[in-house]
Amino acid sequence: MRLYLMRHGPAIDRDDPDCPPEAERYLTTKGIERTREAAKCLAEIGIAPAVLLTSPFVRAVQTGEIVCEVLGVEPKNLHATDALKPEAKPSRIAEELARLDKAEAICFGHAPHLDDFIAYAFGAAAPMTTLKKAGVACLDVTTFSPLTAQLRWLLTPKLLRSLGS
């Protein structure tokens, strides 16, 4: 499976007096712009995910919706899963993806959870990557039990913007 992992775009700061509860934090105007720019690069690369999974947290759902819009994918194909909540065990993502058994998927989530998943895929005890907000990693998953994968690339939002222009 070709798997893309995308961290949500910049969201309202926790220190902002208007900040809602954690699960309801939303993308800022800058976050929406950065996410759209990253999504345009993904479209140019030609990704075509059969599966789109997101954390149920608002900022991750918004990120997924923007990517759906840019890729021309129906938003109804974006599915929220507790496996992508920040506190979920990385193994839950693998279990969810194994059940779906598709050739290409994208997951929208949070740091350090997505970095923990990448480490889990390599059998590492600690994260060895740092996904930036609106950054994307691409993995080729060879097996789900045990989970094994190769990291193809990891792009920061800045690199995505430069590739998309």
Model segments located where?
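Active-site-proximal alpha-helix that buttresses catalytic centers in soluble enzyme cores
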Residues: 2-84, 88-91, 114, 127-134
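Beta-strand elements within well-structured catalytic alpha/beta cores of enzymes
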Residues: 2-6, 104-109
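Active-site catalytic microenvironments for nucleophilic, acid-base chemistry
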Residues: 41, 66, 70, 99, ...
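A polyampholytic, Gly/Pro-enriched intrinsically disordered region
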Residues: 97-106, 148-157
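Non-DNA-binding regulatory cores of transcription-related proteins
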Residues: 99-104, 111-135
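Domain-level recognition of soluble alpha/beta enzyme cores
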Residues: 124-150, 156-160
